[in-house]
Amino acid sequence: MNEKYAALKSNVSMLGHLLGNTIRDAHGEELLAKVETIRKLSKTARAGSDEDRNALIEEIKSLPDDQLTPVARAFSQFLNLTNMAEQYHTISRHCEAHVCEPDAISTLFSKLSQSNVSKLDTAQAVRELNIELVLTAHPTEIARRTMINKLVKINECLSKLELGDISFSERDKTERRLEQLIAQAWHSDVIRQERPTPLDEAKWGFAVVENSLWQGIPEFLREFDQRLEGHLGEGLPIDARPVHMSSWMGGDRDGNPFVTHKITREVMLLSRWKAADLYLKDINELISELSMVKCTDEVRELAGDQHEPYRAILKQLRTLLGDTLESLDAQMKGELAPNKVILTDADQLWNPLYACYQSLHACGMGIIADGSLLDTLRRVKAFGAHLVRLDIRQESTRHSDVLSELTRYLGIGDYDQWSEQDKISFLVNELSSKRPLLPRKWEPSPEVQEVIDTCKVVAEQSKEALGSYVISMARTASDVLAVHLLLQEAGCPFRMDVCPLFETLDDLNRSKEVMEQLFSIDWYRGFIQNHQMVMIGYSDSAKDAGVMSAGWAQYSAMEALVEVCEKESIELTLFHGRGGTIGRGGAPAHAALLSQPPKSLKGGLRVTEQGEMIRFKLGLPEVAVNSFNLYASAILEANLLPPPEPKQEWRDLMEVLSEVSCEAYRNVVRGEKDFVPYFRAATPELELGKLPLGSRPAKRNPNGGVESLRAIPWIFSWSQNRLVLPAWLGAGEAIQYSIDKGHQALLEEMCREWPFFSTRLGMLEMVYTKCNPQMSEYYDQRLTDKSLWPLGERLRNQLQADIKAVLNVENNDHLMERDPWGSESIRLRNIYVDPLNMLQAELLFRTRQQEETSPELEEALMVTIAGIAAGMRNTG
């Protein structure tokens, strides 16, 4: 094996060895020997030995039921540890240049200088920089909070062991600590026994903030400030807020009946409690640090005649935060809160802390001011009094149901049956009216009451506590106006961003038309104050039309929305609903952002970060700093050095690719009569529905086919059996079609000169590398009826043909040539993922033979699902 990744390899083998010790202690030498045999066979089978592959299959088939779980857990833990070693490697001092992101910000600044971008323009772009990451729960984030805390500690140990001057006894102590942590992880329950509640999911999100972002954001801003100072001669203004966090956990009720208005209220209280708790730790640290006496008159006035003025001010804040925790505790328990002043607004912290900061600078103690105090000030700007801003998300028909029920009660007809024009007239009329619309004696159905109650919870909060109100499956202008009306009726005292989410192919194509219609309404134009947010859906459009077609529809919609908002002088923020997978838009962030249409990042970036991707991108402070550097540099680059406008012939060819790929995709998914039975038999789709993975059901409609499946289980199921079908189906076929029609040279030009197109192909390469046709065939043979085998065979042949077509256009000999680290990292994990796949196929075979699944087999199955998800990385 090449020397390139020696440090990583040695960490992987050390962690593997320690895990082996744990397995031996827990289950004896015999089981460890079995795990080792399977691992070695997997390695040689991967290298091409058919004999060893057959031996591996037999070895797994012969495992007794009671060994399935420990063997599955062994490989699952191997993968978790490999992922951690790899994540650590990207921030370690041994990291190779092509692995560690080179310093993205400095690289960008030298690019800007070479392109003669003025410092004035750069400074302006920095002032406007806005990165908002929206944390969303994710059924496939199988790692529990318990495990996440252990991951952070394991990283600390790896970091210690890397120090050159570590003493022998210190090394010994650290290795023992590592072994303890690995043993703790082994003996903890990896998998949740019950479905997490929306409250559990929110707590998971807060744990990420506490363990990583609380340190990571000020750390990033400190580095960013130094880079700016070096390049522009001026740093980041103290009150700048380039990064902030929002969340859907506890606010996203689309298709999730468990997220009620009560849950939303509770999550918002918890969020404020967590913020106060974290600030209190900061303030206590500052009390111990700021023992200085000299101060300005302003601070003297705030502190009174205390000898240590800074401490006096900080102690007042300590009391404020203590009272806040007490009051929120009482509210969460449903008790009467004590009547004390509590934290409701970030300025209550900012003003006194900023006064201390200015005073220290004025008195010649700038070096002290720029330490922990500056970090706390940056946190106050980034996290506010609420830690994260909560979005509300609801499906469009839930709002029209309210209005239908209401209009029927009022005797003026059925809102749902009206034409779009009549709906708009009614809504605008009511929005402009001074009298309330909801009658006092009206008793709505429970579903309608729930929507009204949610709007009331929104109206009780402060504007700072909330992000936007997202309408999923938005199709028309009336969908947006309806929400504005319901919020107005609930007495909402501020203007909340109401954000339509366009997610199917048709809705994306019509998004411009819908927004034009809204902007032509005088009431609406006046109300939005020239600011509009629109969300682009990635997952449902890909499930509807395949990745190539969906990707082009998303690009075209963004372009059209930028154009219409520019014409109307409206500031547009595009909100991207991209998940971790390729089928759901998950290209590596930097590449994905630079492949968007020109001007689409002018209003900043707002993007959802999901469960398992939160852990990979933001799970450790140093990793989060890297991610923010990439986001910041990509946004600045996109705004200061915009990508080229696509040539007309590129667009024309993209239209063809889109049409051909959509047809090829739908011919299989909708046209093949055997497709649904094949999907159900060859993947763990049915079993996934039973697992306690997320708080929301896997289906919108329990009886429907593929179209009723949520996008996440749809993609997740296919990544489990390694065919990863939704992430490539249709794309390669369309490329081959265009080559056959004589467009090879044009495709090659697009690949060289158009970031949008080259990113698409790069994503396809990564998917192809993760596919394993041989494994998918094994699932077919073990699990599906013989009559379905030809369909699986056709799909695998198509996959091989598609790979050839993409490599042909890129002029590459093999996949991921330009990303050796990415390819190495997939290779490293395959040795552990393959046995898990075989175990899973075996478990599916055994459980499907039984009337009643034994808990033992069910647990083993869940472990394989978690392990394969960890091994495939961007899973769902």
Swiss-Prot record:
Xref: PROSITE patterns: PEPCASE_1, PEPCASE_2
Gene Ontology molecular function: any one: phosphoenolpyruvate carboxylase activity
Enzyme class: lyase
Catalytic activity: oxaloacetate + phosphate = phosphoenolpyruvate + hydrogencarbonate
EC code: 4.1.1.31
Co-factor(s): Mg(2+)
The entry's keywords: Carbon dioxide fixation, Lyase, Magnesium
Record-stated family: Belongs to the PEPCase type 1 family.
Protein name: Phosphoenolpyruvate carboxylase
Organism: Aliivibrio fischeri (strain ATCC 700601 / ES114) (Vibrio fischeri)
Gene from which the chain derives: ppc
